[in-house]
Amino acid sequence: MKRISESGLEEILILTGESPKESDVKYIGEACKIAKKYFRVIGLEVYPMNSSDYAYLYECGADFVTVFQETYDPDRYSQLHLGGNKRIFPYRFYTQERAIKGGMRGVGLGALLGLNDFRKDAFATGLHGYLLQRKYPKTEMAFSCPRLRPATGKSSDYNCINERELLQVICAYRIFMPYAGITISSRERSGFRDNVIKIAATKISAGVDVGIGGHTGKEHKGDEQFEIDDGRTVKEIYKAIKDAGLQPVMSDYIYV
């Protein structure tokens, strides 16, 4: 984390898989405590938890929780998740609300566009965020816009959406919820990301390395979870934002 912070980043996202056995709450909490030494904002993208767990992680320094419903169609969801805790649709659906009750100042939502009819899932995602905002007006809402992309060991192009359709979704989110955050990941190509920050996006990742140990110089090749299309460094992303006539902001959260 020290190495990442030296790049100039002030926010970090801590990720785990879906197994509490491999990454229990205490382990994630220790990671948050370490991250708090180097970063202003700590986001979590981990398996769904109970409110008490989120309260503990908040005390450890976490600020923000993102969970992807993947698809909002219960029938399609059950086809894709045959076992394990992840198969429980309602528990995953109410994750953001439990995180808010646990003290988190913000939550993120997203469907994996392409698993089902992307327009229906995008509509459901927007409605989910809108209803949460109505119920918890002081909580920051944000949308992520992942779509099916190549993954290690897998090859599938069914229901994949193109950039034009993805931009349609992003613009719909912006019109529907003008003050929500919109995040665009490094899995999208640089040209697309450079354009979308001028239109609707509020946050983009930079200097991403998805391999284990990638920032330490001891990366285990072949362990990457997925491929990225925009491999630019933090300095390169910073310059691209300025060249677009925009102001790069490493963190917009002020502690008082």
Task: Please tell me what each predicted stretch does.
Residues 82, 114-115, 150, 206:
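Generic structural "secondary-structure junction" signal
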Residues 50-59, 105, 115-131, 189-200:
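Catalytic cores of alpha/beta
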Residues 30-38, 56-60, 98, 102, ...:
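Alpha-helical structural signal in soluble globular domains
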Residues 23, 27, 83-91, 117-124, ...:
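Alpha-helix N-cap and loop-to-helix initiation/capping positions
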Residues 11-14, 28, 32, 41-43, ...:
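Amphipathic, soluble alpha/beta structural segments
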Residues 4-99, 105-109, 115, 137-144:
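Core AdoMet radical
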Residues 123, 134-256:
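Auxiliary Fe-S-binding modules of radical SAM enzymes
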Residues 1, 28-32, 54, 93-96, ...:
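Generic structural signal for well-ordered alpha-helices
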